[in-house]
């Protein structure tokens, strides 16, 4: 619906008319009744990570690992609160840490993915939550193994530019090389794993790099059809990170990127984190956002701990003020709930939950 050159010109433009024209185009083209969200629990199995991103506060040097009883307690509490997504995450390649490796061995596991698989299988067997894993770079065989117990999986592309590997954002983060991330997203497509990816805006990228990243996601999705949602996430400066003095992207910049994401990505859902956009989130709905992402009544956002989740009643108020309806979803979007896209275990669990009848 828009060319690369047109998209770059739009981001570079200071014309308010350009913005209003494209907002009108989006609202005339994409007819929406519902804005969705996922009610989840956030389970950070470990915060140690081989990457040291300039904007990250999630990473810890301490090689800690959540114990099974800690995880199961959160899952059971979340189940009682009506959560339906279990977001499992940990730092990339935690197995490189000797102390974590020893902790895993003491529990009878050779690696973190064996431990993760058991926890996710337990989740399916003992709760009404569905696992979604986002743990950094995984290879084809690892993705294939985890597909068996995951409703969907995710990895932020962040940006497709290799140039950022030489900047404060990613110079100490080998796992953030776009070739690795693109390869993983493509492998997920080959395996028919419903997938979440996204861009991180404000980490030193150029407008051209933003546009090229959106077109790269489009290219991959056109080949495999597995990208269910794209997150447009704004960088937030935090005390103590290397990029604490970096300027955050303006609301207008975010608005324009969201507009382009909708025009370029078409039928892929566009998500923004509501806890990072409390004052501007409603405006972004006008630009094509149709999903608020995961929010939790139990656990905090460990990636952005300073930003509390809004309550669901707040999301409903923000949504209904624009004449739209708020609707809860699973971590896998309804259009991917089929035997074509899900493992037998996960598909049968969703049928057992009666979700498709709701």
Swiss-Prot record:
Reactions the enzyme catalyzes: 5-amino-5-(4-hydroxybenzyl)-6-(D-ribitylimino)-5,6-dihydrouracil + S-adenosyl-L-methionine = 7,8-didemethyl-8-hydroxy-5-deazariboflavin + 5'-deoxyadenosine + L-methionine + NH4(+) + H(+)
Pathway: Cofactor biosynthesis; coenzyme F0 biosynthesis
UniProt entry tagged with the keyword Lyase: yes
Swiss-Prot/TrEMBL keywords: 4Fe-4S, Iron, Iron-sulfur, Lyase, Metal-binding, S-adenosyl-L-methionine
Function: Catalyzes the radical-mediated synthesis of 7,8-didemethyl-8-hydroxy-5-deazariboflavin (FO) from 5-amino-5-(4-hydroxybenzyl)-6-(D-ribitylimino)-5,6-dihydrouracil.
Record PANTHER family: 7,8-DIDEMETHYL-8-HYDROXY-5-DEAZARIBOFLAVIN SYNTHASE, FO SYNTHASE (COFH)
Subunit structure, interactors included: Consists of two subunits, CofG and CofH.
Family: Belongs to the radical SAM superfamily. CofG family.
Protein name according to UniProt: 7,8-didemethyl-8-hydroxy-5-deazariboflavin synthase
Gene transcribed to yield this protein: cofG
């Amino acid at each position: 619906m828009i060319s690369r050159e047109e998209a770059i010109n739009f981001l570079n433009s200071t014309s308010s008319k350009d913005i209003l024209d494209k907002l009108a185009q989006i609202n005339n083209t994409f007819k929406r009744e519902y804005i969705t969200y996922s009610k989840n629990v956030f389970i950070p199995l470990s915060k140690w990570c081989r990457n040291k991103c300039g904007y990250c506060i999630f990473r810890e040097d301490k090689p800690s690992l959540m114990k099974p009883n800690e995880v199961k307690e959160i899952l059971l509490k979340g189940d009682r609160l009506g959560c339906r997504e279990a977001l499992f995450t940990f730092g990339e390649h935690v197995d490189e840490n000797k102390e974590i490796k020893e902790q895993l061995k003491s529990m009878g596991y050779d690696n973190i993915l064996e431990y993760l698989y058991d926890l996710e299988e337990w989740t399916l067997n003992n709760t009404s939550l569905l696992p979604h894993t986002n743990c950094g770079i995984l290879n084809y065989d690892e993705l294939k193994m985890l597909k068996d117990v995951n409703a969907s999986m995710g990895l932020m592309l962040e940006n497709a530019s290799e140039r950022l590997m030489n900047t404060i954002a990613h110079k100490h983060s080998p796992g953030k090389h776009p070739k690795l991330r693109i390869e993983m997203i493509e492998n997920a497509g080959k395996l028919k794993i419903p997938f979440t990816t996204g861009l991180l805006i404000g980490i030193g990228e150029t407008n051209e790099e933003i546009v090229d990243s959106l077109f790269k996601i489009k290219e991959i999705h056109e080949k495999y059809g597995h990208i269910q949602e794209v997150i447009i996430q704004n960088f937030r400066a935090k005390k103590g990170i290397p990029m604490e003095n970096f300027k955050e992207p303006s609301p207008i910049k975010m608005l324009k990127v969201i507009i382009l994401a909708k025009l370029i990505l078409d039928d892929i859902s566009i998500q923004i984190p509501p806890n990072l956009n409390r004052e501007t989130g409603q405006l972004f709905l006008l630009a094509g956002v149709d999903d608020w992402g995961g929010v939790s009544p139990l656990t905090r956002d460990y990636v952005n701990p300073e930003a509390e989740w809004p309550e669901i009643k707040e999301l409903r108020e923000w949504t209904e003020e624009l004449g739209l309806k708020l609707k809860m979803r699973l971590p896998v979007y309804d259009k991917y709930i089929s035997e074509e896209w899900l493992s037998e275990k996960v598909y049968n669990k969703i049928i057992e939950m009666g979700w498709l009848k709701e």
